[in-house]
Amino acid sequence: MSQHYQHDVLVIGSGAAGLSLALTLPEHLRIAVLSKGELSQGSTYWAQGGVAAVLDDTDTVESHVEDTLVAGGGLCREDAVRFTVEHSREAIQWLIEQGVPFTRDEQHNHEEGSFEYHLTREGGHSHRRIIHAADATGAAIFNTLLAQARRRPNIELLSQRVAVDLITERKLGLPSKRCLGAYVLNRESGEVDTFRARFSVLASGGASKVYLYTSNPDGNSGDGIAMAWRAGCRVGNLEFNQFHPTCLYHPQAKSFLITEALRGEGALLRLPNGERFMPRFDPRGELAPRDIVARAIDHEMKRLGIDCVYLDISHKPAEFIKAHFPTVYERCLDFGIDITQQPIPVVPAAHYTCGGVLVDQHGHTDVPGLYAIGETTFTGLHGANRMASNSLLECFVYARSAAADMLQRLPGTPVPESLPSWDASQVTDSDEDVIIAHNWDELRRFMWDYVGIVRTNKRLQRAQHRVRLLLSEIDEFYSNYKVSRDLIELRNLALVAELIIRSAMQRRESRGLHYTLDYPDLLPEARDTILVPPIYGD
C-alpha cells in the first residue's frame, strides 16, 4: 500500500544545499529530506576543494566579486554575485558553528592576514580565500551536517526515495499553480507515496549524467530541473556545462578525477602512438587553462576516433610520483595501471551544470510554494563559466536565504488538504527493461559526441532529432509500465538533454563553456538563454 505523508517543508535532495536549509529552519517545523539512494550519494560528499569566501583581512568583497565576474565571461548577474559574496562570511561562520573541522592555520600570525583557518588559492581567485578541510572538504561538511540533522527530531531523513513528479494545483485541475508536494517512489516497497507540504524545495543537484563521461555520482540526472520544467518553471543557461579535462578512463573506474597537479609537475598528454599534441593547441602546452586542454583532448579523440588519450608522468622518478601523488598512484594501481611505468588513460568528464531553474535571491521559482537551491538552479552567480569553489558557497548562502524567506511566509501558508494517491491502475510491470538500458546508453553517447565540449550546428541538429525520438519512446514506456529509479532518471535526463540542446542552438556565439565551430566569436552583447515551458504563466 502506498503511504501519505504530511510535512511543513519537503526537501528533495540530501546534499549541502538541502541539509543546510533543513538545519537553518526552526525545530518546531516538520521537515522531510529525501535521498534517491543512501544519504551520502550526492556530489557534496565527493567535493575535494573547498568553499570560497572573503575571510582574511587582506581580501575584499570587491575583489571576490570582480574575480567571479571575470570568470563568468560577461554573463554573471552582478546583483547575484554581490549577494552571494556579501553573505559568504556568515555562511562560513554558520558551518564552523555546526562543527565542520576546517583545516586550521598552523602559522596563525602569518603576514598575509589574521584569519585562524588555512586558506588556499585556486584558479581565477586573486587572493587566498578557499577554506577547506584538508583535501576532502565535501566529506567533512556533509558528515557534520548529516550528524546535526540526525540529532533533530523534527527532521525526517528518508533514503531510497526517488521523486517522480511535483504535485501542483494546476495538475489537479485547479485554477492556480501552487506546488503542494510530490509523488515519491519508495524503492524498498516499490510503491509511489504522496508527500504534501506547505513548501517544497528542489535541492537535487545538476545534470552531468547526461554525458557519457562524468566526474559526478550516478544520481546527477537533472531531476530537479526536469520536474520544475514540467511544473511550469523557466530554466536558464543550460548550454554551459563545465568539463574537467582528465578523468580516469577505465570500465570499473567511475568518476575518478586525475588531479591537474600532475600536469603542474610535468605530466604530458600523449596520443596512443606516444605523440604529444598540446603544443599544437597552446604555447603553454599541458599547462594551458582547463577549458583549452579539454577542447584539445576532445578534438583529438574526434579526429582520430579514439576512446581516450594518455597522461604520462612516468619520466619522473618513481619515488617523486609516490610521494607527491599517493592517492592517484594507489587508485590507478587498483586498476592495474602503474603510473611510475605507464601512462594513464584519460578522458574529459562533465563536471558541473552552470545553468538550471530560474530563481531569485530567496530561491523562489516561477511556481508558488516551490523553492530551488544549489546546482539545480540558475541564480546568475556562475555566468558562462563557474569559478572554483563558488558552487558550495552558493549552496549555503541560498539555502539560508530560502529558509529565512519561508519563515516569513509560513503564517499565511496552510498545509495542503488531502491529495489524490498515485494512480498505477493502468500500468503493468515491465518485461522490457532492455529498452531503458539501450535508450540510456544512446542518450549519453550522442550527447557526448554532439553536444559536448565542441559543438557545431549539424551536431546539435542530429542530437535534437535523436532526443525527440527518445522522448517519444520514453513517454510511451512511462505511460504503460510501473516506474523505477532507472525509468524516472531516464525520463528526466532525456528532457534536460533536450533543453540543453535547445539552449545551445539559441546561442550563436562562443562564450565561456559553450564553444561552437560555426560561431567561434563573441557577440557584442552578453545575453542569458531563457527557455519558457509550455504551461508557464497563469
UniProtKB/Swiss-Prot annotation:
Q: Where is this site: Important in orienting the L-aspartate substrate?
A: 122
Organism, by scientific name, is Pseudomonas aeruginosa (strain ATCC 15692 / DSM 22644 / CIP 104116 / JCM 14847 / LMG 12228 / 1C / PRS 101 / PAO1)
The main place the protein resides is cytoplasm
Compartment annotation: Cytoplasm
Q: Name one GO cellular component term.
A: cytoplasm
What family name appears in the similarity comment? Belongs to the FAD-dependent oxidoreductase 2 family. NadB subfamily.
Q: Which GO terms describe its biological process?
A: 'de novo' NAD biosynthetic process from L-aspartate
> According to the UniProt entry, what is the EC number of this protein?
1.4.3.16
Under catalytic activity, the entry for this protein gives: L-aspartate + O2 = iminosuccinate + H2O2
Citing just one GO molecular function, the answer is: L-aspartate oxidase activity
| Protein known as | L-aspartate oxidase
Keyword Phosphoprotein: yes or no? no
